[in-house]
Amino acid sequence: MKQRQQLSRRSVLRGAGFGALGLAGAALVGCGSGGNAPEDTRVAAKDAGTNIASTLGVTAPVVAGTPRKGGSYTTAMIAKLTHDPANGVNSGAWPMLSELLLEGDPLTSKLAPNIASSWEVADPLTLIFKIKPGLKISNKAPWNGRAFDAEDVAWNFERHAGLYADRLKLPKAYFQRGSLIANFMKAEAVDKNTVKVTLTKPNSAFFSSLSNNRMMTMPKEMDDIGFKDPMKFAGIGPWEIAEYQNDIRVKYTRNKDFMLRPNQPWFDEVVWEGIADPNAAVAAFASKQIDAIDITANPDAFPLLQKTRPDANVYSWPTGTYKNLRPQVRYAPFRDFRVRQALHLAIDYADIATSTWKEDWVYLLATIPAFDEAWSPVKVKSLPGYNPDTKAQDRQESARLLAAAGFPLGKGLSWEIITEGTSAANVANLTRFQGQMKTVYPEMDIRIRPLSDKAALDAVWTKGEFQMQMGGISVPPDAIVDVIQNYHTQGSRNYGGFSEPALDALLDKAIAEFNRDARKELFNEFQTKFQNEWRPDYLLHLPRVKTLVTPTIGGYDKVSGTFGTGVNVGAARVYYVNK
């Protein structure tokens, strides 16, 4: 990150004009003096989310009434917080304290200005961001209300990319969001309100990736402040931390200097109560101790809450987090594609999903069907391994593959699966999987080891210290970026250690492709080989979110969707209503 003289700019595309597209939705132009790119080189804006939303539907009731300023909003904090956005299973307090450079629509992922007022393509390897002036960091030492400017933004880019790994004495793999901004070389503050990003190669998903909720910005001094004491944190977001008791209670109060969205935040304060037990959280909502609850991972609670809180509004949509079962390919048996494919053919995906989610789920192959490039749930259901009607035939092929790999009827196959023990859905899904394999292959030995919480799981799976792992993967707002993160040799979420040169080459080509049809064709090739030749992962199903909210709170219809904010971090956008 360097301060530079005023940039001499060439012909550019302004983000305010085509921001809905991200780089995935516009050709890189500006190399010559002409204005727009030819029509056939552009990627049209895709209505990400429409495909799956039409399959499952979106329920988002509008609460009538006038928004009222003030009041307190309380929700349950079930997961342990991890506070460095570059690493960990969540971004901790930062979605409350700070903001994203660009925002994506909750359903469509269409981009809109946020910290950046415009985003431009100067040439295939040069991106220009204009930062809104007047943004202030909270009035807390050492910042004391100083301006948040281009130098902070440039620092965030370089830190997310892992450029400071050596200086911080951290492994490059620590910076898990690096593949979100693949091909990043450097960021420079041209002036107080202009950032120039240089890429090593074109990246067709760079802009859309910046709307991922793990890409929260921070003041450039945060590495010096450290991430151990959240009471020292500050940002430009709608909230300030007023109280922090680890795993017990976090209280936020309104940041009076917040300026990005008029009137926000509406509430005076937000409280996250630490309730580790999902059933205790259900009881808290039933007794009106908390104002909203996400019961996606605890679907059996819905009938109870329908009785105890019949007044609550129900919001539901296709989640952006799929359930997966990932083999560690460094474990010898899983290096063999035949073993990995045999397990796929033996799994009864519908049995696992319906036992937990009833009918509130869909099939998926390599990423969520919200993406235009992804195969539809109907197509996936028709494929070997997924199709319930051909399960007996598929299991015969499974046995043949295992025998050819040296494990006749599963004999000699033994492994442990780790998961988050506090997730009832994960444990139930694994128990179902274990039972299926025991029925099909009685001599196969599968053990389940639930870990205490997400933080404990994160400490193990990010190092690849497992034989198989079950969890949930929250996708970024771009299909190519999602699969690069998870399956490219250099992918920052490639916890299973999968490495296939042909896959790497295909995805490297796809990320640099800006023609919509060509991009989709490349992704189609990827999905075909994922199904027939690679099988690095088992995406079990995609559940449907179910959130209940106190009826006097409005605004949730604006944050509901596959790429929405959720009951906790969306607090600045919701409000009490005067009816």
Predicted ranges, named:
Residues 361-404, 422-428:
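Structural transition elements
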Residues 138, 198-216, 230-280, 301-322:
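Aromatic-rich, solvent-exposed beta-strand/loop patch
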Residues 117-167, 196, 284, 333-335:
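Aromatic- and charge-enriched surface segment that lines or borders ligand/interaction sites
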Residues 71-123, 158, 165, 232-235:
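N-terminal lobe/hinge region of extracytoplasmic solute-binding protein
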Residues 1-11, 16-27:
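N-terminal secretory signal peptides
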Residues 356, 389-392, 443-462, 481-551, ...:
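Extracytoplasmic/peripheral linker and loop segments enriched in polar/acidic and small residues
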Residues 120, 130, 152, 166-220, ...:
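Surface-exposed binding/hinge segments that line
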Residues 547-579:
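Long beta-strand-rich cores associated with HINT superfamily self-processing modules
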